[in-house]
């Protein structure tokens, strides 16, 4: 088996483990804690475990993976530990215990997102041409995970591939499936090509590992605006990842929610191919602005027409524009602005501001907001009554951030419509 095929399988399993439960976890929690006070905060806190773990992930990778042990071995150990933790989560019924078990799992899982990238980088001849093709298998893994747990092919017809399991997306079975996949993946990781630590013997620089040495980029007023707006836009972003699955499930799709949500990743693949085309014609500022406004439009559709299935599907299909136009363009802009010796730390800093700090704040805000408006997420009637208030708040927030960005961001040097786009990569992780 070729190295590229082995790495493709690695990427597939990496995102299958995450995707098989993350989209539908909110639905399970809303049923498990139905009628309990503070149910929205319970859901928000549970999703916040992923973002808390994202803040610590660079330390694990930067110290263990870069200095102490082979990355494929570390990846295997972390996923074997994760398998046990996921199975444990499936047995819990106390919200506090679920929080700590999920947090421990994500502390194991989040560092592996960086590990699989560096394993790939160390074992391919041409990173720019080969990595995007290998990374695509991660998105495919996320899509297949949604179809698997929903036991439906994009909602078009039934796909019963989990013997003995019914309604996997609304029960603890989703964690058990993820646990089995994580265990298989853990053992498989030990067969991956050797990826020894490249920084062995070098001093540990915590500031560099966290990307804080790239803070000097903030001296560029345009980049400062980009960084602040990236943090702010990820506050409403958290609403999508934490609550859309249970919202569309209660309103329209039920057990098939994972299959319908997978259309968002299909859209992501489609618009990923179009990013270079649009970027050369619109430039950085307009691309980022379109991505921000797409979030506002999606939430407005959810809030104003929640009972219209076609409109809800449009909101899901907007994922490609929401994610690719903002995050991929932002990654490219950062790569252009940062000096060569600072590009890795600059990307790490953007990750901390967005997937870490921004979504962390968002997960707590969505829990507080849901309870403040009295949202009952466990029933269709509850969502129908509370959808407008719940979704229009992040829609309005996204519009405000977009206006701030439009009025304050301008970088003529890097907003060229004819610049070299090059190869792009993205992390639909939380896709």
Residue ranges and their predicted role:
Residues 1, 192-228, 425-427:
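Juxtamembrane intracellular "pre-TM" segments in multi-pass secondary transporters
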Residues 1-54, 222-260, 327:
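Helix-loop boundary and gating motifs at the non-cytosolic
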Residues 6, 89-91, 181-193, 390-424, ...:
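Multi-pass alpha-helical transporter architecture, strongest
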Residues 12, 16, 85, 89, ...:
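Hydrophobic core of transmembrane alpha-helices in multi-pass small-molecule transporters
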Residues 44-63, 262-274:
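Central cavity-lining transmembrane alpha-helices of secondary-active solute carriers
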Residues 56-93:
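Conserved MFS/SLC helix-loop-helix module at the cytosolic interface between two early adjacent transmembrane helices
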Residues 73-87, 286-301:
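Structural signature of the two symmetry-related core transmembrane helices
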Residues 151-180, 368-398:
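A membrane-interface helix-boundary motif in multi-pass transporters
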